[in-house]
């Protein structure tokens, strides 16, 4: 079985700076694998047998040049890495991202596609579903467990009140939640071995992808202004204290 696990590179949250204008400055933010996609990579590694092949795939802009992140991906189980880099994919919305991934996936060849439920930055939860639609494949999201029985997969979806169990044949698309596993920390041997694994770097023209006419435009991302706290503490439940609390709430709402 050939498994492709798709991932997104996102900025390191602790390095993002909020400017006085409430915009976000990413200048000093290093790239990292989106946390939800670490679960997808781990799920692929746990599912694969010795005879299977795992390929990791991502599309994007300048963040893909980060050699540290490339090694991190390959140290987590994939046998090869595919990168599609184009300036137009730097801030692509889900539909364009999905079209680029689908084109690359068809060129690579696959049996099973595994995505994280959403990305660690926007968490739109759309890309995996859109790729399945573009490729006309069955798609299951909210996947919390995967078992393998030959070429049949037994999938669990943990819902609000129950757990669905679904049998599925490949080819298919799975979007896994963070509950499916705890991603392992790569061993030193795996990190050293990652440098010997193949990295395939493509441009948009290599997969016949071009940006579509936008149905929506990402104008910007802003942080909501923080409300100054009043620092009023009421530490008892006497009638007087309750009346005081009510008075403070009235003032805050008016």
Curated annotation (Swiss-Prot):
Keyword terms, alphabetized: Electron transport, FAD, Flavoprotein, Transport
Secretion signal, residue range per the UniProt entry: none
GO molecular function: electron transfer activity
Gene3D superfamilies on file: HUPs
GO process annotations (BP): DNA damage response
Pfam entry (one): ETF
CDD domains assigned to the protein according to its UniProt record, in alphabetical order: ETF_beta
Functional description taken from the UniProt entry: May play a role in a redox process.
Family: Belongs to the ETF beta-subunit/FixA family.
Subunit structure, interactors included: YdiR and YdiQ form a heterodimer.
Protein's UniProt name: Putative electron transfer flavoprotein subunit YdiQ
Source species of the chain: Escherichia coli (strain K12)
Gene: ydiQ
């Amino acid at each position: 079985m050939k498994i492709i696990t798709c991932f997104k590179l996102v900025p390191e949250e602790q390095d993002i700076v909020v400017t006085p204008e409430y915009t976000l400055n990413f200048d000093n933010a290093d790239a990292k694998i989106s946390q939800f996609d670490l679960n997808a990579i781990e799920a692929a590694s746990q599912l694969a047998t010795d005879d299977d092949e795992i390929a990791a795939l991502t599309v994007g802009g300048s963040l893909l040049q980060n050699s540290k992140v490339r090694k991190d991906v390959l140290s987590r189980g994939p046998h090869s890495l595919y990168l599609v880099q184009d300036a137009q994919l730097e801030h692509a919305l889900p539909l364009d991202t999905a079209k680029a991934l689908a084109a690359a996936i068809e060129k690579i060849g696959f049996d099973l596609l595994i995505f994280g439920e959403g990305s660690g930055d926007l968490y739109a939860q759309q890309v995996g579903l859109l790729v399945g639609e573009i490729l006309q494949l069955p798609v299951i999201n909210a996947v919390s467990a995967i078992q393998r029985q030959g070429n049949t997969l037994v999938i669990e979806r943990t819902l609000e009140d129950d757990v669905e169990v679904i049998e599925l044949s490949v080819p298919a698309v799975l979007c896994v939640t963070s509950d499916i596993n705890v991603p392992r920390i790569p061993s030193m041997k795996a990190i050293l071995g990652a440098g010997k694994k193949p990295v395939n770097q493509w441009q948009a023209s290599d997969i016949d992808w071009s940006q579509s006419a936008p149905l929506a435009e990402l104008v910007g991302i802003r942080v909501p202004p923080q409300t100054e706290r009043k620092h009023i503490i009421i530490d008892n439940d006497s009638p007087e204290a309750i009346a005081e609390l009510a008075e403070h709430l009235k003032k805050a709402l008016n």
